[in-house]
Amino acid sequence: MSLTVKCPTCQAPVTWSADSEFKPFCSERCKLIDLGDWASEKNVIPVKSEFDPEMLDQLGYDEADFFLDENPFKDDKNQ
């Protein structure tokens, strides 16, 4: 018995087998539509932001400090 799945793009039935060239998609067109959605960021993988604006407050900086001409973290070695 073969497994049948729905095409993620158009919901058409797709038989999951070795000769299904575009699985899980039904066609190259649907595959490219999906790729375009990822490339244009319509599809994204949700992640928790590692940047916490409140952390700046704890360090004694505000966001404007990061746009100054002088880098407060610069040392003589990095010039």
Curated annotation (Swiss-Prot):
Assembly notes: Interacts with GyrB.
Cofactor note: Binds 1 zinc ion.
UniProt xrefs under NCBIfam families: PRK00418.1
Assigned keywords, A-Z: Metal-binding, Zinc
Gene3D superfamilies in alphabetical order: Erythroid Transcription Factor GATA-1, subunit A
Family stated for the protein in its record: Belongs to the DNA gyrase inhibitor YacG family.
Gene source species: Shewanella halifaxensis (strain HAW-EB4)
Source organism phylogeny: Bacteria, Pseudomonadati, Pseudomonadota, Gammaproteobacteria, Alteromonadales
Protein name: DNA gyrase inhibitor YacG
InterPro entries in the record: DNA_gyrase_inhibitor_YacG (IPR005584), Znf_NHR/GATA (IPR013088)
